[in-house]
Every structure is written in C-alpha cells, then in structure tokens.
C-alpha cells in the first residue's frame, strides 16, 4: 500500500487499530524483563490468538509485534544479530492472522531505541536514522502495508524514524 492508497482507504472509512498488545501479553504470562519479540516468537500461538481476536472484533490494522525489534533494543538481550530474522518472522505472524481472518492490514511497529541523542547522550542523529532504516528495510521486505511510529519520548527520535521511513519506502507512516 502506498500513501495515496492509504489516504483513499482512510477517506472511505474509519480505520480501527489493534489494542493493548503488551498488556495482553503480560496477562497471558509474559514475564517482566524479557525481550517481548523473543517471547512472542517462542509463544506464537499467544500472539496469533490475540491478533485474530482483534481482527474478529473489527480491527482493520494490526501492529506487527516489532515494537522494540531494532538493533539497540535487541542488543540489550544479546539479540542484535537476529534483527533481520526476528522482524521477518514477527511480520509473518501478523500476516498469518490477517490471512486466517480474510481481512486487515499489517503495520510495521517502530518505537524508541532507549538511547539519548547527543548532547544528552552519545547517539548522533544520523546514526539513529540509520538504526531505523535498518529495521524499516526488513519491515518493507517482510511485506508490511504501512509503518507506525509510537510511544516516542523524543520529538527528535520521532523525526529520525519518519525521515528513515521516507528515505526507504513509500509506505504510509
């Protein structure tokens, strides 16, 4: 889906997004302190059930569970070398839910890295853009219909994610 197609869809109807994925995963037994994406890949049935329930309740857009699946967050768990495969598998899981229900779109989900930008931290703006580009390239390859940037604590980091998206693809953000 490109930005024009998304705008047409948005003009035709109110689009309903999915719900509190993290909260529901914790209610389903995900312990605190684990990598959520790794937990989901080890408990695919929990995520698939949650996402199909969202779609059956009328959700139009599922957020692929790629929320913190960027290099910096994955590094906290020693999983940064798994970025490509984890993002591919997580998007595939959401696409499976859409296929099983026969409707819906999958949004690649991006959030903050947890690192402060210079001068408050060591991370340079261009490095941050590159970190988002790395994940977005995989999300596009995996077949996301659009991208979402959420739960950001910094306008600069939000800007970096949007710039990265616009440099990589024509997907709606």
Predicted regions and their residues:
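Domain-level signal for soluble alpha/beta catalytic cores
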Residues: 1-173
